[in-house]
Structure formats: structure tokens, C-alpha cells
């Protein structure tokens, strides 16, 4: 497929229009609006506050056929949500759900202490959902338990099911914050399930608008925390998400993996939400005002000014015992960590793009028992670092290749803008330069080594003009750089590269 930096539907002019929005309109709204025409979404913020300033992309409208529709040979036509709830519990079917909009109102039957709106117990099914919209409103989610890790809108127990063309969206039919949401829209517990050409519109979480300033998982001291992720894959192997779009507009992950052996995301687009921290100080009521505009998570301190924060968690995130993850031809934008993959086995990214990262673009590591590889990947220098190798296992014998692109025309660097931090042992880093203008002075730095995480016996090829800083724990490395190098380490070899062409040729992995 090749590099797709700005596909036709994601042109810079479209991005600029979205940036002009003072707040996200209801997702059902169509067409463009001026700032004056936009109103607060009271499902996402308190009425007492001014419209929240965000950078977000409006999800596309679903394509629902007005007349005839296709039912493929061998498929059973289902015309109601009640029927659909029953057939997803059976095996070996081909089901066609009649196009239209369906809204669930009540929970499904509990199973093994778990609560959900839909329970897919069946296996070896094909669900043709083209032209259908299945809505899970917060009013229905509020009927589920408030216990952590117990509720999901959809729980897929079965294996080898295929979901084709579905449009799944949350509806904010209660005012913020007078609702509760399920932990995940989808929780996948079976093996070898596949989502193809599906769209997920995820919204609704409490609090909203502050990233993790008031908590994230255990240990938060900032009051009630009700997160909502799109998809969790738990103790399940060989699942696939292909040609799908996720609009993650709530505080939660787009996709998170736990104890997984084999996962593929291919030709996907994941879009989150950003907010300038200066906008928080305009609030008259709510969580920030209650805590005197101070962060309550991992220490009490003032909310920083002049930064850009994500209102979501990570795009694709791994947790314990994850191996054999393959990400290809995928774009993640405006998420906290676009790709946060910490594996015990193989982690491979190919043509994976990160844009306008909310905290960092890439944190890719694997233990010495596996290998992490980034091939032909892409990122910009909009607001936050490209690399964050300060967490997870220290990379060993991993390969990283990335191309740096221009940020959006109307973006401005923040105090956190830069190439970030890399660490590892016997690793190979190649950083290509596709920018058309100089990197912002003062924000053009790549730091090698971090506190107790060294960079040793590695090669770094820096094609950009960024300054490479070698910390004291950088040893026995070869640094080929177009930009300046500050060497505070030991026994390193620094080689000046005079043009980006020379770097590209030398750094080629072909």
C-alpha cells in the first residue's frame, strides 16, 4: 500500500476546518459549521463552563441504504435487535442484519458474573452488518455494574467470528456527568475473531477533558474515575482488526491487549482528541475547579500551561505477556501514546504512522526473548515527543526505522516537543528526514540514554538536523548524524553526515 501520510479523506484543509471547532458537535450533525453555530455538547461537559476547545475529527456518517440492500447467498436475514441478540449465541451461521439504526435499551443476561449489553457466545459465525448502526447509549450502560473490569458493552466469548461493515457508536442521552459507562465497548475473550471494515464511535467517560490529571487506573486521588475504551483483547490469540476506523473520543484506550499471542491491526485509522491546557483554566465548575487547577495523580502539582494533552489513553497498548503483534499500514493520531507496545515476544510495525501525539508517538520494546521492529514508520513533531523509551523492558537487538514529517501548518511547538528519548542495547535506529522546513529551534533534540536506562553497543543514524545528546550512560555506540552531537558518554564514535541523501543511502535496510 505504501506510505499514506494524508489520505484523500484526511487532507490538511480538512484538518484545519476541524481545528477551528470550539467543541465537538453531536456526531449526528452533518456538514461544516462556523464557531458561532457550534454549541456545547452537554453529554461531555458541564453547562456552567464555556465550550471546550479541542482538536478532534468528526466521524463520518454511516452509509445506510434507503432502498434495496444485498443479502449474500447463504445468509439468514435478521430484522430486529432481539433476534440478533439470540443468534450471536449460536455457532456456525451466516447472519445478515437488516440495514438501519438499532439502539439497545437493556442489558443482556449475565454470564459468570460479567455484565454486558451483547454476549457473543457463538463461534464460527459471519455477521454481515453493512449499512447497520448499533448504538449503545450511556443510559443502557448506566444499568451495568460499577465494579471495575466487570462490564463491557459487547463481550465476545466465541472464536473465529467475523464482523463485517458494522457501525458501532455510543450515544450521550444523559447529561455529563450523570451517567456511567462500561469498561470497554468490545471485550474479546475468544481466539481468531476478525473485525473488517467496521467503524467505532466511542464517547462518554467521567471525568472528561483532563487526560489523567485526576487518576488513571489504581492510585488516583481525584475522585470518581469511569473510563471507556473501544476494544480489549484478553487471554485471546490470533484476533484481527482490518480496514477499521476508531474515533476514540472518551478517556480510554482504542485497543489494549492482555496476555495475547498473536494480534493483527492492518489498514486501520485511529483518531483521538487533544486539548490545550490553557483552555482548562477557563472552567467555572467541575473537577479542575474543585481541585484548584492542580493535578491529583502521582503527586499534587499545578496543571501546566502551554501544553497539549490527550483526552484519551493510548491508540494501541499492550500489557502483560503479549507477543507476536503485527501493526501494518495504520494511522494513529491525537492519542496519548499512539503506539505503546511492550512485549515478551515479537512486535512488528510496518508503515505505522503517528500524528499529533498527545504524550508520545512510539514506545516499542521487547524482551531479549523476542524482538521489536519498526520498518518504514512515520511521525511528526507537533506537540509531544516521538520516542519514549523510558518505560517497559530495555530494548535488546531491536531495529527502528522512522521518517520525520512536518507538523500541521497551524500547530505550534510546546515545551515537550522533540524527538524524545531512546535507550537499548545492540539496537539499530534510523531516523529519516522528510520535513520541508527546519525543525523548530530548541525543540530539535534526540536524547540517548535516560537515568538508569542506557544506550549501549548501538547504532544511531540521524538524517535530521536535530541535535543528538548522548547522556553519561551511552557507551560504545556509533552515531552518524546530520545534526550536531553532544557526547557526554564514553567510547562512542561520532560520524558527521553532510546531507540527508547520504544518510538515507547509508541507513537503508534494503
Q: Residue locations for each model-derived region?
A:
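Glycine-rich repeat segments that build the extracellular carbohydrate-interaction surface of secreted
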Residues: 68-79, 86-110, 126-131
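Bacterial N-terminal signal peptides
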Residues: 20-30
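Extracellular beta-strand-rich solenoid/capping regions of secreted or surface-exposed proteins
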Residues: 85-90, 103-126, 135-164, 170-194, ...
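Short glycine/acidic-rich loop motifs that flank beta-strands on beta-rich extracellular proteins
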Residues: 106-108, 136-142, 172-184, 200, ...
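Boundary at the C-terminal end of the N-terminal hydrophobic targeting segment
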Residues: 33-35
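Short, positively charged and aromatic/hydrophobic N-terminal segments
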Residues: 6, 12-17
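All-beta strand scaffolds that present successive hydrophobic residues in beta-strands
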Residues: 97, 127-129, 158, 162-165, ...
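Right-handed parallel beta-helix/beta-solenoid
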Residues: 37-83
Amino acid at each position: 500500500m505504501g506510505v499514506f501520510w494524508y489520505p484523500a479523506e484526511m487532507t490538511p484543509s480538512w484538518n484545519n476546518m476541524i481545528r477551528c471547532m470550539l467543541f465537538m458537535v453531536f456526531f449526528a450533525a452533518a456538514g461544516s459549521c462556523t464557531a458561532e453555530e457550534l454549541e456545547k455538547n452537554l453529554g461531555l461537559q458541564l453547562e456552567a463552563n464555556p465550550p471546550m476547545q479541542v482538536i478532534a475529527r468528526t466521524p463520518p456518517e454511516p452509509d445506510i441504504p434507503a432502498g434495496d440492500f444485498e443479502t449474500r447467498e447463504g445468509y439468514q436475514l435478521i430484522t430486529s435487535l432481539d433476534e440478533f441478540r439470540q443468534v450471536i449465541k449460536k455457532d456456525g451461521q451466516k447472519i445478515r442484519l437488516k440495514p438501519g439504526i438499532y439502539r439497545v435499551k437493556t442489558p443482556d443476561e449475565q454470564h459468570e458474573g460479567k455484565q454486558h449489553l451483547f454476549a457473543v457466545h457463538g463461534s464460527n459465525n459471519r455477521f454481515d452488518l453493512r449499512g447497520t448502526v448499533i448504538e449503545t447509549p450511556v443510559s443502557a450502560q448506566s444499568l451495568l455494574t460499577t465494579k471495575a473490569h466487570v462490564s463491557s458493552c459487547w463481550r465476545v466469548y466465541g472464536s473465529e467470528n467475523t464482523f463485517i461493515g458494522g457501525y458501532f457508536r455510543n450515544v450521550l442521552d444523559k447529561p455529563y456527568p450523570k451517567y456511567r459507562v462500561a469498561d470497554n465497548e468490545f471485550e474479546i475473550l475468544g481466539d481468531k475473531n476478525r473485525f473488517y471494515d467496521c467503524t467505532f464511535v466511542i464517547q462518554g467517560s467521567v471525568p472528561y477533558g483532563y487526560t489523567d490529571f485526576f487518576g488513571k487506573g489504581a492510585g488516583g486521588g481525584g475522585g470518581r474515575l469511569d473510563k471507556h475504551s473501544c476494544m480489549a483483547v484478553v487471554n485471546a490469540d490470533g484476533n484481527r482488526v482490518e480496514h477499521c476506523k476508531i474515533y476514540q473520543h472518551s478517556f480510554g484506550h482504542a485497543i489494549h491487549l492482555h496476555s495475547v499471542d498473536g494480534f493483527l491491526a492492518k489498514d486501520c485509522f485511529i483518531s483521538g482528541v487533544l486539548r490545550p491546557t490553557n483552555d482548562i483554566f477557563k472552567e467555572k465548575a467541575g473537577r479542575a475547579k474543585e481541585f484548584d487547577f492542580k493535578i491529583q495523580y502521582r503527586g499534587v502539582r499545578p496543571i501546566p500551561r502551554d501544553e497539549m494533552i490527550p483526552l484519551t489513553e493510548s491508540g494501541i497498548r499492550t500489557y502483560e505477556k503479549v507477543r507476536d503483534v503485527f501493526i501494518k499500514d495504520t494511522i494513529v493520531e491525537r492519542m496519548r501514546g499512539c503506539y505503546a507496545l511492550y512485549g515478551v515476544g515479537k512486535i512488528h510495525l510496518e508503515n505505522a504512522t503517528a500524528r499529533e501525539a498527545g504524550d508520545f508517538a512510539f514506545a516499542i520494546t521487547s524482551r531479549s526473548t523476542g524482538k521489536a521492529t519498526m520498518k518504514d514508520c512515520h511521525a511528526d513533531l507537533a506537540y509531544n515527543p516521538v520516542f519514549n523509551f523510558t518505560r517497559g523492558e530495555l530494548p535488546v537487538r531491536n531495529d527502528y526505522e522512522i521518517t520525520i514529517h512536518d507538523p500541521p501548518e497551524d500547530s505550534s511547538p510546546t515545551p515537550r516537543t522533540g524527538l524524545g528519548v531512546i535507550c537499548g542495547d545492540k539496537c539499530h535506529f534510523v531516523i529519516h528526514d522528510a520535513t520541508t522546513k527546519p525543525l523548530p529551534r530548541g525543540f530539535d533534540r534526540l536524547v540517548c540514554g535516560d537515568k538508569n536506562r542506557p544506550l549501549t553497543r548501538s547504532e544511531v543514524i540521524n538524517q535530521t538536523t536535530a541535535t543528538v545528546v548522548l547522556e553519561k550512560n551511552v557507551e560504545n555506540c556509533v552515531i552518524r548524524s546530520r545534526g550536531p552531537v553532544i557526547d557526554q558518554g564514553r567510547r562512542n564514535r561520532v560520524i558527521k553526515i553532510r546531507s540527508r541523501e547520504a544518510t538515507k543511502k547509508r541507513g537503508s535496510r534494503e
